[in-house]
Amino acid sequence: MDVKYKRTKPYQTAKLPIRQPRIMTWLLYVVSKLMMPWGIQYKIEKFNMEGVKPPYFLLSNHMYFIDFQLSAMATYPHRVNNVATIDGYYRRPWLMELLGCICKRKFTTDLHLIRSIRHVLKKNGDVLCMYPEARYSPVGTTAILPDALGKMIKMSKVPVVVLLHHGNYLYTPFWNYRKPRKVPLYTTMTQVLTAEEVEQKSVEEINQIVKDALTYDEYQWQVEQNIRITEPFRAEGLHKVLYQCPSCKTEHEMASEGAQIFCKALGDG
């Protein structure tokens, strides 16, 4: 993506997010439902959510844009403020603001973010959604979660809910997201910590509970669900993550086409 910096207006990350208008909550739900891919089965199940109402922390794994759609459907009718990276504000900052998103720069300490989170949870009493992996999963497994997450949860003193998606990565893998596959999608929404447990447990214990709840392996799930991916293009792009030849150990000489991945250094193409 070409960015014309002279035309780009600096975004004020210090300002507090707005409370998501009720009409936007409804519209987001309807649009998300209508935009779900035709012919793809999906299911959202809730566990240990009886009586759980905002405010609460919502933590989700992150595999592709469809995560946001499933999240909007799972949390409806409650208002949600999503923590979003600043690159998402490049084209339509007004829309991100209207949705109540909280702007965040990646891999930096941001005191304004803490202030915004407290504003959402304490003043507005809404849902605060974060994707702690901070990126799309490149290989379909859990990324390293920041230790600061437990401190933030401890400080908030609200329940913690985990939204765990399965199938989203297999449907549109990071390395070939332009060609979706016919894979069923399954999302679970689970309360993993009550407000009382957050107060009682240590930061280390909270981090471990969250880590366990957000652990996933898309390929293991595929095997367990007996899912076959038969699209003729299923290997295209795989060389972007499997960049080292397992035979000659040469790096960055892998290539892929159709349902095959091969090493150019060995002349396997």
Predicted regions: what they are:
Residues M1-Y5:
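Soluble, non-transmembrane catalytic domains of enzymes that act on hydrophobic metabolites at membranes
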Residues P21, T25, M36-I209, E224-Q225, ...:
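Soluble catalytic domains of membrane acyltransferases
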Residues K157, T215, E253:
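Hydrophobic/aromatic-lined pockets within catalytic cores
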Residues K33, H119, D212-Y216:
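A generic structural signal for well-ordered alpha-helical segments enriched in polar/charged residues
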Residues T8-V30:
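Helix-enriched interaction subdomains in cytosolic or periplasmic regions
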Residues T230-G269:
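Cys/His-rich short segments
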